[in-house]
Amino acid sequence: MAKEQVQAITKMEEDFAQWYTDIVKKAELVDYSSVKGCMILRPYGYALWENMQKVMDEKLKATGHENVYMPMFIPESLLQKEKDHVEGFAPEVAWVTHGGDEKLAERLCIRPTSETLFCEHFSKIVQSYNDLPKLYNQWCSVVRWEKTTRPFLRTTEFLWQEGHTIHETAEESQAETLNILNLYASFCEDYLAIPVIKGQKTEKEKFAGAKATYTIESLMHDGKALQTGTSHNFGTNFSEAFDIKFLDRNGKWQYVHQTSWGVSARMIGGLIMVHSDNNGLVMPPKVAPVQVVIVPIAQHKEGVLAKATELQEHIQKVARVKIDASNKTPGWKFNEYEMKGIPIRLEVGPKDIEKNQVVLVRRDTKEKEFIAMEQLEERIPALLEEIHNSLFNKAKVFRDENTYSVTKFEEMKKVADEKQGFIKAMWCGELACEEKLKEEVGVSSRCMPFEQEHLANECICCGKEAKQMVYWGKAY
């Protein structure tokens, strides 16, 4: 039996990176593949991605977006059409040079992102303003040859959705860019229980080839920031490079206004690092593959499994539920489902059946309560909502307690050295100051938040007139 015990994980206070790796492995989300930086998404991990995908897909379709699929391969000549774009991705591109034994006439890039393919397609199908807008989304995997990798957070191949839209006017494309950012923010907060900060990236941090990049940023348990999703307004940068024109309402040729936006399985990494603890994964209920697990106690005794099955039939009307009727001990099962982060555990044994009750245990707080069996259908949905709110509020309190406002350079340096979290400081808008803060303080600009605060008149770095408040931090 000793070999069957669920192994303990490294404590996050001792080694956060190892704690994270232990969770993704021991909660059976992923396994490593034989290709460096690639991961195998196991059934439990993929079910989590599917739940996230389902919600996002419904939200996108409800706002008029259509799913398409583009090829995996991009000809080198096509990738090079937008200069800033290709320079931004060149170091990470994987190339196909041979088909069988034959050398290809032109190298093919395995898509790191699909802007160029969408642009080529749009240039063929758009003639007039009547053809606009086009609101496309793609679910796929992309490849970026990363030097340092970690499951979900930074992998050579990763799953994502990428949206690509074209519009008649600059106002429409800007509205689309911000609407999608808001959709991402509400998904993070309302489904993953992760509080986010919405804002714009600086020129240095924006997407290669974009006119403007908007982001949602979250704070992880180790005080580092995670860019959880981005939405880009391209203006006419790509449409000019790819000659995507339409006849406007006055019979004149115009370039389309374009957007691009995406979120990836990196959100799963965020979910782990925001909510989980030293006992394993803590799953936000709304996306959890299993929301309730029933553990029969003394299941060999008459009536126990039958009662557990009866409870499952009632609960499955209101939640995703499973019974573990394996021959493992109850203690092993408790540890296993704690590690996997299932929000609610129900225990039912002979004594509970006599009293017409079950023992209910919350994963997030470990609180136990006795619930009458007939109340479960009503109690469980309410409790799942309660758990979601509790996780969100706990994460928000943590973020707020680890966000610091500074007005002097030395003060910023001290906070960055001694604390972990977001640092709010004023900035003049100059690249030189942004680079100096990266070099001397060790922080990057996370975003210029939409909700601005006036902390001082001067830039934290050079003392010149400040233009905006910026969130700074160490990041994944």
From Swiss-Prot:
Catalytic activity: tRNA(Pro) + L-proline + ATP = L-prolyl-tRNA(Pro) + AMP + diphosphate
Signal sequence, start to end: none
PROSITE patterns: AA_TRNA_LIGASE_II
Predominant subcellular localization, coarse grouping: cytoplasm
GO MF term set: ATP binding; catalytic activity, acting on a protein; proline-tRNA ligase activity; transferase activity
Gene Ontology biological process terms in this record: prolyl-tRNA aminoacylation
EC numbers: 6.1.1.15
Keywords for this protein: Aminoacyl-tRNA synthetase, ATP-binding, Cytoplasm, Ligase, Nucleotide-binding, Protein biosynthesis
InterPro entries: aa-tRNA-synt_IIb, aa-tRNA-synth_II, aa-tRNA-synth_II/BPL/LPL, Anticodon-bd, Anticodon-bd_dom_sf, Pro-tRNA-ligase_IIa, Pro-tRNA-ligase_IIa_arc-type, Pro-tRNA_ligase_II_C
Record family assignment: Belongs to the class-II aminoacyl-tRNA synthetase family. ProS type 3 subfamily.
The record's note on its domains: Consists of three domains: the N-terminal catalytic domain, the anticodon-binding domain and the C-terminal extension.
The name this protein goes by in its record: Proline--tRNA ligase 2
UniProt source species: Bacillus cereus (strain ATCC 10987 / NRS 248)
Gene behind this protein: proS2
